[in-house]
């Protein structure tokens, strides 16, 4: 009654708005740490281990607007890296369970051992931030932080993508990360925007 549905079909998810979404995503990312020139990724990089269930979750990239978005249209970090680096092998592993945060270290280590660099996605799910989602403890999940620590034992460069809708505490993993990007939830073009930033 109050919307022009035909106009909505033409505008929502149009190429122009997706380009704007990608651009605003790039401008929203905050570089918190970058040691030993971990970023941008070296042109010589040929194998990336992408670890962390958030890196392959379309719904979580929309944050607390997830119920209003079109999940199938979201570009995950996994998709974004493969598009941005077509000549690079991207080996993905969950690393942890999205629901329970139980660690899946064996598959994460296997992917990490085959890589030149490790990119780890940690943080909050779509339903953990937003209106009426206050928390007494804003520390990144202990198992997710432990995952970062364990992956650093490979001796490889570790880049952390910190996702969520609020500032978070991550003292336990910080010493084990060579670079940390606060990527928030960047919406439909999340994966493309993040891939642009790290390249």
Give the predicted meaning of each segment.
Residues 3-5, 11-15, 19-199:
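C-terminal non-catalytic regions of proteins with extracellular/luminal or membrane-system context
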């Amino acid at each position: 009654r109050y919307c022009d549905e035909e106009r909505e079909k033409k505008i929502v998810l149009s190429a122009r708005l997706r380009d704007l979404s990608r651009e605003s995503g790039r401008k929203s990312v905050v570089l918190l740490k970058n040691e030993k020139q971990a970023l941008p990724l070296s042109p010589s990089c040929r194998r990336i281990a992408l670890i962390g269930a958030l890196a392959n979750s379309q719904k979580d990239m929309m944050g607390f607007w997830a119920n209003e978005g079109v999940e199938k249209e979201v570009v995950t970090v996994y998709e974004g890296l493969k598009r941005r680096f077509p000549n690079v092998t991207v080996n993905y592993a969950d690393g942890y369970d999205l629901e329970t945060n139980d660690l899946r270290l064996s598959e994460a280590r296997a992917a990490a051992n085959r890589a030149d660099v490790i990119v780890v996605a940690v943080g909050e799910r779509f339903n953990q931030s937003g209106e009426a989602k206050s928390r007494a403890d804003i520390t990144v999940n202990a198992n997710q932080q432990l995952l970062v620590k364990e992956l650093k034992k490979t001796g490889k460069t570790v880049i952390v993508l910190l996702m969520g809708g609020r500032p978070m505490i991550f003292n336990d993993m910080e010493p084990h990360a060579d670079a940390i990007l606060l990527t928030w939830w960047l919406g439909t073009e999340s994966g493309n925007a993040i891939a642009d930033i790290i390249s």
